Amino acid sequence: MNGIERIGEYFLLMGRVFRLPDRWRMFWRQMSKEMEKQGLQSILITLIVSVFMGAIMTLQTKLNTENPLLPAYSTGLVTRDCILLEFSSTILCLLLAGKVGSNIASEIGTMRITEQIDAMEIMGVNSANYLILPKIVAFMVMMPLLVTLSMFMGLLGGYGISAITHVLPISEYLLGIQYAFIPFYVWYSFIKTVIFAFVIASMASYYGYYARGGALEVGKASTKAVVNSSIVILLLDVVLTNLMLN
């Protein structure tokens, strides 16, 4: 199957997904489970990566911008903008594409090869809507919360490395993360995150839904979901940055 056929198949699947659920109670129940699985179970890795990346950004920025012409607070300013504009949205989504995306693809793919999806279709259930819609909506709801947590922990990581290593006075770091703050950067990050969350969940669901064969094919589908969604995220990042910040 060539790329154009895959794109068409993807949009046809999304047409089946985005329909009103037959049973709203079941939808909310499934969505709450997915929010826990995709969001709450991703908090720990988000905390760890964000703290260390914030610390590394602060350390690298300070050590590589030793210039008497640059004010000391510029390190905090650069760290803040890097975290708000790219790390907590794009890089975190790339990270979670591997965790959440592969999980979604393997879960749906396993249901496909064990003929559970076929059984749903025989019973007249819209399997695409029942299985995929709660996953997409749940991830789009949880990602902005994870991004907010990532922003806070990233800035906290920079504060921590400043306090521990004394590479930068804490007062200068705090001044830097407050200096010339642009609130739109936060909204820009949230908008990107919601779009990226949709890409991750929908593409992972697509590759899992159309998996064929056995366990090996499910593994290949998971790999394709992660790789291709990561590529699409990077392409969209360029487009959205040009549209929203240019």
Give the ranges of each region predicted by the language model:
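Short, membrane-interfacial amphipathic segments enriched in basic
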Residues: 1-29, 207, 212
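Selective transmembrane-helix segments that form parts of the transport pathway or gating/packing helices
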Residues: 39, 43, 47, 87, ...
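Hydrophobic alpha-helical transmembrane segments that constitute the membrane-spanning cores
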Residues: 49-52, 96, 133-162, 195, ...
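Hydrophobic alpha-helical transmembrane segments of multi-pass membrane transport proteins
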Residues: 75-118, 203
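Active-site cofactor/substrate anionic-group-binding motifs, chiefly glycine-
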Residues: 38-91, 95
